[in-house]
Every structure is written in C-alpha cells, then in structure tokens.
Amino acid sequence: MGRPYREAIEGLIGVSNSVVFSHGKESGPWGSKITAMAEVARDLKFEVLSVDYRGIDDPQTRVHKLIETLSAPGTSNLYTAPVLVGSSMGGYVSAAAAATLWPRALFLLAPAFYMPGFEQYTPQDVPAPTTIVHGWHDDIVPVENSVRWAREHRATLHVLDSNHRLEDQIPTVCALLREWLKSLP
C-alpha cells in the first residue's frame, strides 16, 4: 500500500489489535475455518469478533451490517483500524467496507470478486494492504478472479491445491494467517 495510507494508519491514536471475521454466504460466524483462524489470532493476543450474517443474502446489506457493527457506540476504541478477514462473500464484504472502516489490513479467502452480473460491485478503492488465499480448484469463484484483483491492486496472492472452501488446507491457511498477522506494523 502507498505511503499516504501507512502514514494515516500510523497517525491514528489507539489503533486496535483486533481481527474481525466475515463468513461466506453458506457458512456461519463460527465455522471450522473461522474457529481455527480465531485461535491463531487469539494466540497472538488479538481481540476477535465474528459478525453473524446468517439470513442476510444481499451482499450490500452485509457490508452495511459490518460497518454498523464496528461503528456502534462503545466499539470505536476496540475496532479502530481493525484487521478484516473474510471468506467468499465475506471477502467481498470486508473489501467493500474497507473504504469506510480504514482497516489495518485485509486477509481474504476466495473473495467473491468479479462475479457474473455483479462485476461492477467488485471493490476497487481498498485502502489497505491485502493478502488473498484461493484454491486452484474453486468451482464457485474462479481463481482467475483473485489473480486479476491481486494484479490490479498489487495484493499478495497464495494459491493452494484446494477448492472454494479450502477445508483441506485449514492448517496451511492458519500458518499463512499467523505469519501475516505477525508481520503487520
């Protein structure tokens, strides 16, 4: 990410040490991936929140829920410049909310970018360093979508021998998350 973003984040007083998870459309706030990644974050002394989007199918409504959750009275100090982690639609939600929330960084799993009929909604103004993890055999969100977004936004991209859910790669995803969280400024 560019110098102005880094200076803006470093200038914040009380930047939180929190990780906020956003699950995918067919999942829940404490599925196996989020549960495993939350353990990693807690082990590194991060506060953890997983937003519950069950029953909300509209991606934009989910974006508004994330923004409202992190902007609610009493949460401002805890969630100043949080780390956003999202899977599939949750990856889209995290990236779309980034322009409002100014996160410290994003870690996205198979984010739902450039989906047919929704290409125009793919987030373009993401003001934070971003890492993407995607499966080569994803039959829901083509891996090419993440390659394209990563190239256009200079994001870090890890492509694993897995499918959309990455369930057979949870230990690898957690290892990537651990090293990534440890590297954050």
Which residue ranges define each predicted feature?
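Catalytic histidine neighborhood in serine/cysteine hydrolases
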Residues: 49, 151-168
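Short hydrophobic segments within beta-strands
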Residues: 21-25, 85, 109, 133
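Conserved alpha/beta-hydrolase "acid-adjacent" motif
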Residues: 30, 139-145
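Primarily recognizes the serine-hydrolase "nucleophile elbow" in alpha/beta-hydrolase
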Residues: 70-74, 78-126
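Serine-hydrolase catalytic machinery in alpha/beta-hydrolase-like enzymes
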Residues: 4-81, 92-97
